[in-house]
């Protein structure tokens, strides 16, 4: 216990009986920690999970009904008169983007993959893109549609493409559009988004499905990789420069069977972390950044400035209408 922490109270879950509660109450009283309530063990509080943790919110059945059930349990088992005042949000401080001047240049829309297969996104990234004149435009690879024509760049976030690998492989218009886009415009892909760029992706049952065939790898189920990572670029790239260091997060259960040659020269960076052997990782090409690692763009505005500069450069170099 850290004595500098001000513990205002605790809520305990999975309490099975009045005796169980009394035992917990006795322990907390001796510690001087207020007990704000005990939630029972009940199916109403259970959430479905899969190989990376909880199932995403959009897959839950009737979320409104769940919230009502949780509210009823809270009224029955929690000291809301004490708990609610403790949960009041503090006074809002300055905007996290207050130190970042907004863009005064032309609007440069950015397509962002957004559907049941691709939805691991930091909200602040979208807010920062808006702030810097790069409004996000949703694109659904699952819907078998072309990337929006107005997009000057493409972001492929993480998600669960392995769960939808068969449907993605049949979305031929999406895959053709992606291949064409990668030849003309900047593309940023991380984790599940990167898997869309490979030759093949194995689904949850181990069946392989063709992907966009932009990068020379096949992806299949592997061991869990999770944790914060220290990243050192091997050379200058779309968003990074040699000699810099970045921090990111890795979280996946798929692995790549890499087919690029030893002298390919496209490795993005050296990746290191706690109990992780340093290794080369990712792809670094003139208009492509692809990696397992999630970056929080709002924590390093340089990334977003470089992204905008790349969009503007490529937009000027292409014929009008492309």
Please report, for each region that a protein language model flagged, where it lies by residue.
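Short, solvent-exposed amphipathic alpha-helical segments in soluble enzyme
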Residues: 1, 25-29, 125-131, 170, ...
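Phosphate-binding active sites in nucleotide-utilizing proteins
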Residues: 106-171, 176-180
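C-terminal and late-domain segments of enzyme folds
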Residues: 104-106, 118-136, 223-322
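Hydrophobic, well-ordered secondary-structure elements that form the walls
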Residues: 154, 190, 212-215, 251, ...
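Internal gly/pro-rich beta-alpha loop/helix module
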Residues: 1-102
